[in-house]
Regions:
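HIT superfamily nucleotide-processing domains
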Residues: 1-96
């Protein structure tokens, strides 16, 4: 896939950026409006170090947005199946 065509590589629409650094960005997902963490590099390969960093950053944002223990990290790739990204979703959501 040409990375210029990947919506998570270009991130032309940025809603409510919660955090960003050279490796990742956390912003509100345009389709479901919950915090979404995106690894900047177009990859699905996840090292242990990447997993630890992504989990820690998204948990910190989730605690701020939803409160302690009121959210979970959804690691399922849906609309963009080939670019690593996760969502912080409310525990009150019915779909998992």
């Amino acid at each position: 896939m040409n990375n210029n065509l990947c919506v998570l590589c270009t991130l032309e629409e940025r809603r409510n950026v919660h955090y960003e650094d050279d490796d990742l960005i956390v912003l509100d997902c345009a389709s479901c409006l919950v915090p979404m963490i995106v690894w900047r590099e177009h990859t699905m390969e996840l090292t242990k170090k990447m997993e630890i960093k992504m989990t820690a950053v998204l948990e910190a944002i989730g605690f701020k947005v939803f409160g302690t223990q009121k959210f979970y990290i959804d690691r399922q790739q849906r609309a963009v199946p080939n670019h690593l990204h996760w969502h912080a979703r409310s525990n009150l959501s019915t779909a998992r």
